[in-house]
């Protein structure tokens, strides 16, 4: 089955046909590093990590670019409020974002360009737009440069809007604009309110790039004038992605062939956002759940579906993933290890259908159910292929518990030290239970069993003694 994906631009599911056979170029808008990342922030990182893993599974040579916006109006405001240099705040928040991605086993992109490292490329692109009559320098002395939206008749085609139906671009003082919808390509330095370090030299005077030009320039540098897939959160469709496409194509760069957008995480029906006070940071969630459980929760939902966050739903997801882990643990004990395998047809078909992760996860659970039957029947030869298939499918989703990436404190399986502690405590309780049973004190034996069950430890009495696993 051909890999098919939903293209936001055409609003239909299309066969993926790369510009160059065997290769795939992917650009995803990364975060503006202004505050500590929360669950809503990292969903995009996880979703597009699954995309790059799937493309590689299909045999594509993937070049994956995920940028970092490290200079921005909000960064300047928040750094001033905290008494920090803007670059200090950006660096600190970038470190926290890196840790969050590590905790969720988000593989690094091929390149992760920062906006501040690519100002020359942005200036060149702005000059091209001015030369082609699609941009102009403001005449109010501000040093601003704007994209002339009315010079590009296709403006609005990504989101299917007419120019006259759009709201004004609230990214700069409108006095220097020919049309309120014109958006800033370059922002002149405001020496009375902005630090000198937040300005770069340009033909229009000191200043800094606008948000939209950053991504166009960086995508062009690392992927060329035309590339396969551009991704990001659904909230970026307008104005950010609309503006990216318009300025790139106006400069003669075809830009993206496909557009993919992941949906929000919501709480009480509203987008998770720090400004709304309804966000949850990654460290806060990882105090109760493992990184692999949070990733499973995010992966199990389709990337285009809004996720209403709740701890109850996260509890259910964690329980579901533990069932998979427990099966693999038991299978590994019987087999002495699990080798490489092949994903089942239902999983492959689901992933080829616009990254259908809900159906893909369901396929994994079905194979696990079959595997548990094989364990009960003692059919080791069939179990070997079954368990290997489960591992292969989990690996595609970044959820293989044996992946070394999950050995970190926030990661997948409990850290080695904690495993030792749990093993010792459970073994001690089992010894007490066996003594109680030998003394025919079944009330005490059952009480120990119930205590273990209450904290998620399942017992199985076998001829070789009791066996335990996490439920």
Swiss-Prot record:
SMART domains per the UniProt record, alphabetical: DALR_2 (SM00840)
Query: What compartments host this protein?
Result: Cytoplasm
- Primary enzyme class: ligase
CDD domains recorded: CysRS_core (cd00672)
Q: Which cofactor does it need?
A: Zn(2+)
Entry's Gene Ontology BP terms: cysteinyl-tRNA aminoacylation
The record, for SUPFAM superfamilies, names:
Anticodon-binding domain of a subclass of class I aminoacyl-tRNA synthetases, Nucleotidylyl transferase
**What is any Pfam family matched here?**
CysS_C
Listed binding positions for ATP are 274
| Motif extent ('KMSKS' region) | 271-275
Residue stretches in coiled coil: none
This entry's Enzyme Commission designation comes to 6.1.1.16
Q: Name one GO molecular function term.
A: ATP binding
Q: Keywords in UniProt for this one?
A: Aminoacyl-tRNA synthetase, ATP-binding, Cytoplasm, Ligase, Metal-binding, Nucleotide-binding, Protein biosynthesis, Zinc
> InterPro entries under this entry?
Cys-tRNA-ligase, Cys-tRNA-synt_Ia_DALR, Cys-tRNA/MSH_ligase, CysS_C, Rossmann-like_a/b/a_fold, tRNA-synt_1_cat_dom, tRNAsynth_Ia_anticodon-bd
Amino acids binding Zn(2+): 29, 215, 240, 244
- Co-factor note (free text): Binds 1 zinc ion per subunit.
Q: NCBIfam families annotated for this entry?
A: cysS
Q: Which family does it belong to?
A: Belongs to the class-I aminoacyl-tRNA synthetase family.
Q: PANTHER family of this UniProt entry?
A: CYSTEINE--TRNA LIGASE, CYSTEINYL-TRNA SYNTHETASE
Self-association state and partner proteins as the record states: Monomer.
In its UniProt entry, what is this protein called?
Answer: Cysteine--tRNA ligase
């Amino acid at each position: 089955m051909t890999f098919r994906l939903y293209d936001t631009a055409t609003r239909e599911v299309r066969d993926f046909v790369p510009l160059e056979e065997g290769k795939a170029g992917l650009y995803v808008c990364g975060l503006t590093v202004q505050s500590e990342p929360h669950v809503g922030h990292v969903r995009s990182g996880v979703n597009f990590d699954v995309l790059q893993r799937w493309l590689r599974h299909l045999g594509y040579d993937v070049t994956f670019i995920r940028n970092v916006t490290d200079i921005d109006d909000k960064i300047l405001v928040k750094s001033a409020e905290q008494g920090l240099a803007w670059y200090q705040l950006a660096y600190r928040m970038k470190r926290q974002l890196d840790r969050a991605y590590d905790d969720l086993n988000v593989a690094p992109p091929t390149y992760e360009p920062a906006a501040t490292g690519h100002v020359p490329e942005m200036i060149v692109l702005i000059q091209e737009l001015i030369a082609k009559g699609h941009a102009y320098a403001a005449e109010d002395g501000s040093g601003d440069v704007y994209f002339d939206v009315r010079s590009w008749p296709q403006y609005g085609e990504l989101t299917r809007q007419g120019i006259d139906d759009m709201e004004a671009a609230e990214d700069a003082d409108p006095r220097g604009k020919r049309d309120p919808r014109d958006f800033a390509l370059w922002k002149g330095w405001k020496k009375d309110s902005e630090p000198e370090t937040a300005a770069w030299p340009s033909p229009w005077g000191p200043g800094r790039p606008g948000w939209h030009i950053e991504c166009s320039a960086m995508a062009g540098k690392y992927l060329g004038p035309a590339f396969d897939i551009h991704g990001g959160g659904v909230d970026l469709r307008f104005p950010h992605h609309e503006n990216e496409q318009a300025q790139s194509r106006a400069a003669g760069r075809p830009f993206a062939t496909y557009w993919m957008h992941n949906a929000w995480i919501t709480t009480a029906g509203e987008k998770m956002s720090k400004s709304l006070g309804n966000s949850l940071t990654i460290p806060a969630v990882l105090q109760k759940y493992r990184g692999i459980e949070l990733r499973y929760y995010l992966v199990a939902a389709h990337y285009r579906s809004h996720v209403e966050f709740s701890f109850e739903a996260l509890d259910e997801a964690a329980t579901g993933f533990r069932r998979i882990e427990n099966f693999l643990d038991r299978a590994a004990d019987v087999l002495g290890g699990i080798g490489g395998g092949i994903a089942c047809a239902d999983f492959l078909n689901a992933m080829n259908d616009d990254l259908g992760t809900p159906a893909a996860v369901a396929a994994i659970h079905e194979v696990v159910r079959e595997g548990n039957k094989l364990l009960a029947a003692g059919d080791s030869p069939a179990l070997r292929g079954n368990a290997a298939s489960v591992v292969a499918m989990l690996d595609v989703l970044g959820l293989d518990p044996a992946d070394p990436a999950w050995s970190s404190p926030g990661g997948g399986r409990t850290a080695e030290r904690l495993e030792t502690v749990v093993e010792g405590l459970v073994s001690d309780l089992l010894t007490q239970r066996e003594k109680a049973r030998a003394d025919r004190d079944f009330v005490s034996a059952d009480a120990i069993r119930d205590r273990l069950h209450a904290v998620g430890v399942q017992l199985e009495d076998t001829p070789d003694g009791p066996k335990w696993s996490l439920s």
